[in-house]
């Protein structure tokens, strides 16, 4: 760290040259081209991911009306990408909410916590989902606990994601870093089969 601080204070031109050289080298990798050509937005990000890793299986007749989909988050960034692909394919508006404990379980620093936990944020999510009949995907740090509550217009589903690749090899639990590394190493076009193990559909799951 002292070396970097010394270079930044005494030789900023060297540091700038090193940064440009690193970015130039990154451009030759898949992730470099991916980030350069497809900024992480709804219009460019998900179609690009879906083209490289087409999602197979897991189709389910989703009920009409707003849906709360409670999931046990186990694979770091990979679960979020897979559920984003699935939700995008349904053709319905969707949002992903991640519990702060998930970040802590994955070893992320406190500043990485981006999940809204106050009542007003929850109310905004619920109002949005009800107005557009959307899907609210909620990632838990542990299996959701059933609670007998009044659901109103909501359809509540709970489950855990089980993944297998096209060869039938099960994809286990990864850290966020290993998930991205796994994605980068898989050849383009290798389909991912989504097996959605539903834990319950009795309307008794609530955050």
Residues covered by each model-derived region:
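A transmembrane-helix-recognition feature enriched in membrane-embedded lipid enzymes
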Residues: 2-54, 108
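Soluble catalytic domains of membrane acyltransferases
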Residues: 37-42, 46-207
């Amino acid at each position: 760290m002292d070396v970097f601080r010394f270079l930044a204070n005494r030789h900023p031109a060297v540091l700038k040259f090193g940064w440009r050289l690193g970015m130039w080298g990154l451009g030759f990798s898949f992730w470099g081209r991916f980030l350069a050509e497809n900024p992480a937005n709804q219009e460019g990000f998900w179609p690009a991911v879906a083209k490289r890793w087409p999602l197979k299986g897991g189709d389910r007749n989703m009920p009409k009306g707003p849906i709360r989909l409670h999931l046990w988050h186990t694979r770091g960034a990979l679960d979020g990408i897979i559920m984003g692909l699935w939700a995008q394919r349904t053709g319905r508006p969707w949002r992903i909410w991640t519990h702060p404990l998930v970040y802590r379980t994955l070893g992320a620093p406190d500043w990485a916590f981006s999940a809204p936990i106050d009542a007003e944020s929850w109310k905004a999510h619920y109002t949005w989902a009800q107005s557009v009949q959307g899907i609210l995907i909620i990632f838990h740090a542990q299996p959701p606990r059933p609670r007998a509550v009044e659901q109103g217009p909501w359809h509540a589903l709970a489950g855990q994601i089980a993944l297998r690749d096209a060869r039938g090899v099960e994809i286990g639990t990864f850290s966020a870093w290993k998930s991205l590394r796994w994605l980068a190493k898989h050849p383009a076009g290798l389909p991912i089969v989504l097996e959605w193990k539903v834990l319950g559909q009795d309307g008794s799951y609530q955050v």
